[in-house]
Amino acid sequence: MEHTYQYSWIIPFIPLPVPILLGVGLLLFPTATKNLRRMWTFLSIFLLSIVMIFALYLSIQQIILSCIHQNVWSWTINNEFSFEFGYFIDPLTSIMSILITTVGILVLIYSDNYMSHDQGYLRFFAYMGFFNTSMLGLVTSSNLIQVYFFWELVGMCSYLLIGFWFTRPIAANACQKAFVTNRVGDFGLLLGILGLYWITGSFEFQDLFEIFNNLILNNRVNFLFLTLCAFLLFVGPIAKSAQFPLHVWLPDAMEGPTPISALIHAATMVAAGIFLVARLLPLFIVIPSIMYIISLIGIITVLLGATLALAQKDIKRGLAYSTMSQLGYMMLALGMGSYRSALFHLITHAYSKALLFLGSGSIIHSMEAIVGYSPDKSQNMILMGGLTKHVPITKTAFLVGTLSLCGIPPLACFWSKDEILNDSLLFSPIFAIIACSTAGLTAFYMFRIYLLTFEGHLNTYFINYSGKKSSSFYSISLWGKEEEKKLNRNFGLVPLLTMNNTKRASFFYKKTYKISNNVRNQTFITVENFGLNTRTFYYPQESDNTILFPMLVLLLFTLFIGAIGIPFNQEGIDFDILSKLFTPSINLLHKNSQSFVDWYEFLRNATFSVSIAFFGIFIAYCLYKPFYSSLLNLTLLNSFQKWNSKRIRWEKLINFVYNWSYNRGYIDAFFKTSLIESIRRLAKLTNFFDKRIIDGITNGVGITSFFVGEVTKYIGGSRVSSYLFLYLSYVLIFLTILFFFYFEKF
């Protein structure tokens, strides 16, 4: 066992050779590196699988022995200061390592097909490998300096992947927005780390916690300053985990490739903030005001994320706000001291949300055959509908993920969310009411996404025949740059069409190639009753096996991962594996833990939350069930208008909620007006002051000296008599002025 821990330091570095070799290969041997690109994918998956096996073994050992292992090396810089670095293996490290590697492997397999036609394929896998390395380094760090180093690397990889298609202005802006927003959090985290070191003199977690607790117990430190340092530490996770008010970057991060959205939202960047709060919880828990702030930020984020998801039309943005809300649940649980519940929900949500994002990627992939390679269209749920019969496997996987996030038993998120709701009732009735209400909203907006996407009829062609003038068609090149394409009107909106029944137009290549008999025999539909020209339409198809396989594995995780934390005992049998794993931490932190004694108590506590979820699903079904006659019924507002045309006040309320949600709560607009515009005005004022005042004075002195010199030169004419005349004139003027001043005094 000790021998195993001795080599645990290598965990973060196992995936690192792939990005290094890819970088060197693309610089020195670009052709050979590109020709072997599938080999790099296999190597990435293989190395990450080794880390997964290692993490599983460590977790099993910790369940058996309930131990924490730390190994530190010291680097002495001088006699007064030495830097210590090492690795820290505890249950939190093990569970996070398993989460990162399992989701990471499945996303890599998925990406091999999803990104196969992209020119940045190798660059993508290099970033992914470095991303996994950074996150593994973060969770195994033994001190705050290492945490901050890998924290920044995780952020850097996220920015690179969010702006992966950097030639698209909207993706570049999203990358910049994520960078600037997280700078605020990272600066706060750095100040908090420095403040804690100034107080305790240590960066090591175990030493830091012990010294910190002793200082508070003995009242040997300014408590206000201590609270400020703890709050600054928390500012970092606020930004990284998209908590209010630094959440604004998360929806825009959907401009990156869909596999990255799955990884960021499930197991890497946003999970990093939750991990850090969990790691530092022994420090936060001794400051009640900080714990209350954490729970308050969490409950605000829970409600805000749910309300902002209500009216989103982009499927990925809807899931992004869902992630924001679920992260709020985790932060709420940590603020209440419910350590186990928070991490349990982190695990269950990670697999469910990864399944949903990979499912959305499969949907987007199939929609691109209809609307072209344009995110504004392929991700727009208003253009979807009726996909059940076209992508049945994707539909099943997406439905399971949706039900899990809604909190329907026995799926994964039911077990963890129910614990958080019960703990919130013990913590604060107001928080419990908000948390339970948001559970209903979660079920509502998740089923809204499902119904708009899979139920009814495919709406793409009907919108084009709605009588409205269609906007110009845009496609995206392999690097993501928007380019306007002129379409032959006989082709409609189908970029993948048959040509003479023997050739097919490919989006990714200019050349044409023969299509197979299977494709030639596929069902097409001809619409003749719109008073327009007869057109042939192409319908979505199920994705390839390499896209479906990770989804099916995640589906199994979503079905069964909740079993590790079943919170009740029956006839002496303890089903709660998660509590056994977290035993050392729970003994210190989890004050609200109350294991359910039997089935009756468990059912009594679960019935209420499940009832709320089913109520949200019922409302969503009533409002968004398919209305084939008009696409206008697909919006929340118009559905209420159909049912409540005479209730003007109710319509105004619904209209307000819809506008609030669709416009992101006007928070982005507020930041733009109050911060961005103010900074721009300040920059313009500074520019004016610098150019007109500072430069004006400097240039004015220079110009004045120049003109005086020129005048003197021309008056003097280089003759001694002229110089004497000027000299005597100056003396006379000086004496005259002196004479007048002298006589004025008398």
Swiss-Prot record:
EC number: 7.1.1.-
Gene Ontology cellular component annotations, sorted alphabetically: chloroplast thylakoid membrane
Keyword Transcription listed: no
Catalytic activity entry: a plastoquinone + NADH + (n+1) H(+)(in) = a plastoquinol + NAD(+) + n H(+)(out); a plastoquinone + NADPH + (n+1) H(+)(in) = a plastoquinol + NADP(+) + n H(+)(out)
InterPro entries associated with the record: NADH_UbQ_OxRdtase_chlpt_su5_C (IPR002128), NADHpl_OxRdtase_5_subgr (IPR018393), ND/Mrp_TM (IPR001750), NU5C-like (IPR003945), Proton_antipo_N (IPR001516)
Membrane topology per record: Multi-pass membrane protein
Main location: plastid
One GO term (biological process): electron transport coupled proton transport
Compartment annotation: Plastid, Chloroplast thylakoid membrane
Key words, A-Z: Chloroplast, Membrane, NAD, NADP, Plastid, Plastoquinone, Quinone, Thylakoid, Translocase, Transmembrane, Transmembrane helix, Transport
Annotated transmembrane regions: 9-29, 40-60, 89-109, 125-145, 147-167, 185-205, 221-241, 258-278, 280-300, 327-347, 354-374, 396-416, 425-445, 547-567, 608-628, 723-743
A GO term for molecular function: NADH dehydrogenase (ubiquinone) activity
Function text: NDH shuttles electrons from NAD(P)H:plastoquinone, via FMN and iron-sulfur (Fe-S) centers, to quinones in the photosynthetic chain and possibly in a chloroplast respiratory chain. The immediate electron acceptor for the enzyme in this species is believed to be plastoquinone. Couples the redox reaction to proton translocation, and thus conserves the redox energy in a proton gradient.
Subunit structure of this chain's protein: NDH is composed of at least 16 different subunits, 5 of which are encoded in the nucleus.
Family to which the UniProt record says this protein belongs: Belongs to the complex I subunit 5 family.
Protein name: NAD(P)H-quinone oxidoreductase subunit 5, chloroplastic
Protein source organism: Barbarea verna (Land cress)
Gene name of the record: ndhF
